[in-house]
C-alpha cells in the first residue's frame, strides 16, 4: 500500500510540473515560436536594379574611353612616323644645300615628294606667321616705349621748368653805407650765377608765385682791409636777417637770423667773417622774402660771397 501511495504521489507531482499546477489543461511542452522568414524581393525588381547598374557602369567606361581618345587626338606631340620622316629629310636637305634659293627649289622638286612638300609648306607658313607675330609685337612694344619715354621726358622737363627757384647775387654798385641795420634791395637776378624761374623779383624782394614748402638760404660775407681806412669802432655786430612779408594780411616776420659780435682791431691787416643760414618754410603765393644786414658797408661784393635764394621742395597737402 505504501509503495502504491508513493508512486501515485510522484505521478501527481509530475503532472503539476508538466501542466503548471492542478486543474491546468495539459498542452504539452512549451517551445519559442520560430522567427518569421525575411521578405524576399520580387524577381522583377532585382532584374531592374542589375540592368540600371550595368548601364551606369557602361556609361562611365565609355566616357573614360572617349576622354583618353580625344586627349590622344589633340596631343600636340602626336606626329606620325611619315611626318617625322618628312621633316628629317627636309632638314637634311637644307643642311647639305647651298645658300641659294634656286638650288634649294630644284632639290626640293627632285628629292621631296608631294606629301612632304605639303608638310614643308605648312611648316614654313607656321614659322613665317610666328616670326611676323614676334617682329610685330616687338615693333609695337618699341614704338610704345618710345612714345612713353617721350611723354615721360616731356613731363619731366615741364615739371623741372615749372619748379620755382631763385638765386640772387649782391649788386655791388648800390650797397648802402653806415653801420645800422638796413634792408638790401640791390640784387642781380639775371647776371652771372644769378637766375630766377617762376618767381618774381621786385623792389629788392623775392616774391612767391606758387604755394608750397620752400628751402630758403642766405650767405653774407663781411670783410675789411686796412687800405679801406680805419673802422669807426673795433667792436662790430655783424648780423643777417631773412624776413617774410605778407601783403594779403599786412605783417612781417623774421624767419632766420645769424651773426656775431666781432673785435676787429687796427693791428690786423685783413678781417673776414661769413654767415650762412637756411631752412624749410611754408610759403603762400604773394608773400615776399627780403634780406636785412648790419654794417652794410663791410659787405663782400663778390657773387660767390654774398647771395640768397629759394627753391620749392613740395606742394602743400
Swiss-Prot record:
Cellular component per GO, a single term: cytoplasm
Tissue: Highest in the peripheral lymph nodes, weak in spleen, peripheral blood Leukocytes, bone marrow, heart, placenta, skeletal muscle, stomach and thyroid.
Pfam families on file: TNF
Span of domain THD: 164-313
Subunit structure: Homotrimer. Interacts with TNFRSF11B. Interacts with TNFRSF11A. Interacts with FBN1 (via N-terminal domain) in a Ca(+2)-dependent manner. Interacts with TNFAIP6 (via both Link and CUB domains).
Homology family: Belongs to the tumor necrosis factor family.
Name of this chain's protein: Tumor necrosis factor ligand superfamily member 11
Organism name: Homo sapiens
Amino acid at each position: 500500500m505504501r509503495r502504491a501511495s508513493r508512486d501515485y504521489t510522484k505521478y501527481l507531482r509530475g503532472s503539476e510540473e508538466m501542466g503548471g499546477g492542478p486543474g491546468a489543461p495539459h498542452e504539452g511542452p512549451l517551445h519559442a515560436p520560430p522567427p518569421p522568414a525575411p521578405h524576399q524581393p520580387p524577381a522583377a525588381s532585382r532584374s531592374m536594379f542589375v540592368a540600371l547598374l550595368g548601364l551606369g557602369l557602361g556609361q562611365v567606361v565609355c566616357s573614360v574611353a572617349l576622354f583618353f581618345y580625344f586627349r590622344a587626338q589633340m596631343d600636340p606631340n602626336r606626329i606620325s612616323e611619315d611626318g617625322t620622316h618628312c621633316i628629317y629629310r627636309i632638314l637634311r636637305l637644307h643642311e647639305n644645300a647651298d645658300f641659294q634659293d634656286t638650288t634649294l627649289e630644284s632639290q626640293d622638286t627632285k628629292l621631296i615628294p608631294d606629301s612632304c612638300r605639303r608638310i614643308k609648306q605648312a611648316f614654313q607658313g607656321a614659322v613665317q606667321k610666328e616670326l611676323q607675330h614676334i617682329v610685330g609685337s616687338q615693333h609695337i612694344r618699341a614704338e610704345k616705349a618710345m612714345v612713353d619715354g617721350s611723354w615721360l621726358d616731356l613731363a619731366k622737363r615741364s615739371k623741372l621748368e615749372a619748379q620755382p627757384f631763385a638765386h640772387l647775387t649782391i649788386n655791388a654798385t648800390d650797397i648802402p653805407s653806415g653801420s645800422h641795420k638796413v634792408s638790401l634791395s640791390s640784387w642781380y637776378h639775371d647776371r652771372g650765377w644769378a637766375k630766377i624761374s617762376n618767381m618774381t623779383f621786385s623792389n629788392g624782394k623775392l616774391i612767391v608765385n606758387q604755394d608750397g614748402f620752400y628751402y630758403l638760404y642766405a650767405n653774407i660775407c663781411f670783410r675789411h682791409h686796412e687800405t679801406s681806412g680805419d673802422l669807426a669802432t673795433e667792436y662790430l655786430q655783424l648780423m643777417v636777417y631773412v624776413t617774410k612779408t605778407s601783403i594779403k594780411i599786412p605783417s612781417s616776420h623774421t624767419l632766420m637770423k645769424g651773426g656775431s659780435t666781432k673785435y676787429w682791431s687796427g693791428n690786423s691787416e685783413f678781417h673776414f667773417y661769413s654767415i650762412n643760414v637756411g631752412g624749410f618754410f611754408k610759403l603762400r603765393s604773394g608773400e615776399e622774402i627780403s634780406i636785412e644786414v648790419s654794417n652794410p658797408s663791410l659787405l663782400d661784393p663778390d657773387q660767390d660771397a654774398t647771395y640768397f635764394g629759394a627753391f620749392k621742395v613740395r606742394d602743400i597737402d
